[in-house]
């Protein structure tokens, strides 16, 4: 896969406040804030990169290969997250800090740029109104598609010799 996008809507118990707006998460070993940390699951170390089994490699070699691949993938993930936030801000109410990072399991692929989009909070009245609006969902999907097209187009240009 050239890109992985996981789309969610969240809820927050009343006692934890009134979160609102869309947020885009990328993978990080350390959460960008307490809210991101609460949403993320514990990290598991993967054994393969791009389908290559590293279990037979010396641990040092496997760790170096995983680290190099993760660095490049995180750079691409962060670049896509910025592109996505730029597209989404025209149609979606964004969180006051729309770009965050945390150790979500769904973002663990070492070799595929990945983001998790929280479109909003069903526990917030204004967000819920947007989430149930077919028109809003269509516009939001279109903005995500534009971001994907823009990102993949740039990657093709960068990869062309």
Residue ranges, per PLM feature:
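Active-site-proximal helix/loop segments of hydrolytic enzymes
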Residues: 1-161
